[in-house]
């Protein structure tokens, strides 16, 4: 699946080429982004080869669940998957039903994964990875390695050691060669434009998640 999706084409066609692309639970350049991962690339032939290796040389059929606002993008993704032999039935649902699937883990097939990408995997990834998590948790596997790392991250008091553990978690899940791919292929980080007066200095706007945005060094040059 991950090799079958052309993320740059999705960005250009549906996000005006303005999305911040990523391939793990972090913004590139942030404290928890792991630069050493093996990355997924758009490689349909490799996708076909891996499907055959897994016993699906003739492909298979599954569902893609989407809300109306994302249906065009999901249809494009379905077409890409179809080219490698993964045939998808598009199932459009309302937001309430989609949210219930996320909470109950009762979806069948594929659906989008919405998550808060912030530099605290113990909290934000924990909402989805923990067996008692609020969203998606009831519909995914919970491998021992990832669960042990999650608990270590939550208990860690040293910031540097915590970031090291968080990068280990990124590798455990998102490395193209060895990762468990629990949450599928990450596409992009949603962001919006911010406008400010040019005399606002050292505010670090857009560089941090709002909940941990530090304005202590900000000053006005006027």
Predicted regions located by residue number:
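Immediate post-signal peptide segment of exported/extracytoplasmic ligand-binding proteins
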Residues: 44-63
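Early extracytoplasmic/lumenal segment of secretory-pathway proteins
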Residues: 87-100
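Short, well-ordered beta-strand elements
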Residues: 59-68, 88-89
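DNA breakage-rejoining catalytic core of tyrosine-based enzymes
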Residues: 36-42
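Conserved dinucleotide-binding and phosphotransfer motif residues
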Residues: 84
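Detector for C-terminal structural segments
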Residues: 2-35, 68-78, 99-222
